[in-house]
């Protein structure tokens, strides 16, 4: 019987709120430092000089107190996040023990402890986030790191995270290359200090981690870090083997952006890796069949509604769906998907007051079927470039559309209150699926007509000097 009730997400949220207090402390300290510690004497007499010196000394003491308050805040924030993660990990372990699923592939059920040395979590941000705040470190740690790897020291790893002409002066390739050097230095420094390391990467920094993994795998035997001392957690990975845009159009090169489509994160990496992808994320879950315009538009909208909105509570991450890998796969990467209930394509309609949600609910089930026809939903570990023609199973599609025709009006009536919440449909296509079974399975090729074309175009484009 359990006598303690804890809400890990509330602890993580509280940690985030406390971090806001710390930001205010730092801002107050910075604002007060100049005007108060360098007071000038009101006049040239001894009394004025003594008064100015006295108040300047008080100001310096106040600055020291503010520094100590800021340091205390940082430790308190990390302690709150650690408590939330500890509760989440304990709850997951208890649940697994009671249900007999301790060896399942669920994110919280697979505790990926490293060698047992003190653990450092090097965390990187996405484009436009070169250094993560204490608040974000605490949230990521609570949701993605501690539930799997246990207690650690979260460290913000600086990387440029630029993408000219949108953000900064570095092209995407330049930003990633500099990020790899910085990350490699950070990893080596921690390993040399006797620490194990888990690297967290999101979006562009997941590409940084991908290139670092490749570089480590290319080292001569004995020079790469021991796999028992290094691991990776990647979300919104643009190099995702089955869905990342840099793999969908592998070989392509855009000289006007200095952007290389350099393929998949190695599925045969010796390093323990946890990869999380949001369904319909236009960067990490890009359509396999781009002739499906609805899928393309939905993925484009998914950049805003999915890629920028990954879950950040331990409970949400624990509900990620494990994705199947190819028969006989013995790699060290675990693949998960966050299912997306509301199609990004319909989000603007949902924003219409009063009528938006009923309209979206009415059309979403059948629209989901049409959007899902742009995806092959093959094995997660197989690098899968884009292809032209989808092997559609017409019987499965007709059945799903027929079901959606009934589910849409039913969901719309629930949304306006004419039916109870219990009447909401509880099957596909109203609910999302990691594999709706709309395609014939003719295998999963890593070479397609579009990959050959994108590779050829990339070779020609590299003859053009990059603009960035």
From Swiss-Prot:
Coiled coil: none annotated. The keyword Secreted applies. SUPFAM superfamilies: alpha/beta-Hydrolases, PE/PPE dimer-like. GO terms for cellular component: extracellular region. Residues 154-375 form the PE-PPE domain. It is found in: Secreted, Cell wall. InterPro entries: AB_hydrolase_fold, PE-PGRS_N, PE-PPE_C. Induction: Expression is high during exponential phase. Induced during hypoxic conditions. Induced in the lung and in spleen tissues of mice during the early and chronic stages of infection. This is PE family protein PE3. The lineage of its organism: Bacteria, Bacillati, Actinomycetota, Actinomycetes, Mycobacteriales. The gene is PE3.
């Amino acid at each position: 019987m359990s006598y303690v009730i804890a809400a890990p997400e509330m602890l993580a949220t509280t940690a985030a709120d406390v971090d806001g207090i710390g930001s205010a402390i730092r801002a107050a300290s910075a604002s007060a430092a100049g005007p108060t510690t360098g007071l000038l004497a009101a006049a040239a007499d001894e009394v004025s000089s003594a008064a100015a010196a006295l108040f300047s000394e008080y100001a310096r003491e106040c600055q020291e107190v503010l520094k100590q308050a800021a340091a205390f805040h940082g430790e308190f924030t990390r302690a709150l996040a650690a408590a939330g993660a500890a509760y989440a990990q304990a709850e997951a372990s208890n649940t697994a023990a009671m249900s007999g699923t301790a060896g399942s592939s669920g994110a919280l059920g697979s505790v990926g402890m490293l060698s047992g040395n003190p653990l450092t979590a090097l965390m990187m941000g996405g484009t436009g986030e070169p250094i993560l705040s204490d608040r974000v470190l605490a949230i990521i740690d609570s949701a993605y790191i501690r539930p799997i790897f246990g207690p650690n020291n979260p460290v913000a790893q600086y990387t440029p995270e630029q993408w000219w002409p949108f953000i900064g002066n570095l092209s995407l390739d330049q930003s990633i290359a500099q990020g790899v050097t910085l990350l490699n230095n950070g990893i080596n420094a921690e390993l040399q200090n006797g620490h194990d390391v888990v690297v967290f990467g999101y979006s562009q920094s997941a590409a940084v981690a991908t290139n670092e993994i490749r570089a480590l795998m290319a080292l001569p035997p004995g020079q790469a870090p021991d796999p028992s001392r290094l691991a990776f957690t990647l979300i919104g990975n643009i190099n995702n083997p089955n869905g990342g845009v840099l793999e969908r159009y592998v070989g392509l090169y855009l000289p006007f952006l200095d952007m290389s489509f350099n393929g998949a994160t190695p599925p045969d990496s010796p390093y323990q890796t946890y990869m999380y992808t949001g369904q319909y994320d236009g960067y990490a879950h890009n359509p396999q069949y781009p002739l499906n315009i609805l899928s393309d538009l939905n993925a484009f909208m998914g950049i805003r509604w999915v890629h920028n909105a990954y879950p950040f509570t331990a409970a949400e991450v624990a509900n990620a769906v494990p994705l199947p890998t190819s028969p006989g796969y013995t790699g060290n990467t675990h693949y998960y998907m966050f299912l997306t209930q509301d199609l990004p394509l319909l989000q603007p309609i949902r924003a219409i007051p009063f009528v938006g949600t009923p309209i979206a609910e009415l059309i979403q089930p059948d629209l989901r079927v049409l959007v899902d026809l742009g995806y092959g939903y093959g094995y997660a570990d197989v690098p899968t470039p884009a292809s032209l023609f989808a092997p559609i199973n017409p019987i499965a599609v007709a059945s799903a559309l027929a079901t959606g025709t009934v589910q849409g009006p039913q969901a719309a009536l629930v949304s306006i209150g004419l039916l109870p919440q219990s009447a909401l449909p509880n099957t596909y296509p109203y609910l999302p699926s990691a594999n709706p079974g709309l395609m014939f399975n003719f295998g999963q090729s890593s070479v397609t007509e579009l990959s050959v074309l994108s590779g050829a175009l990339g070779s020609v484009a590299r003859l053009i000097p990059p603009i960035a």
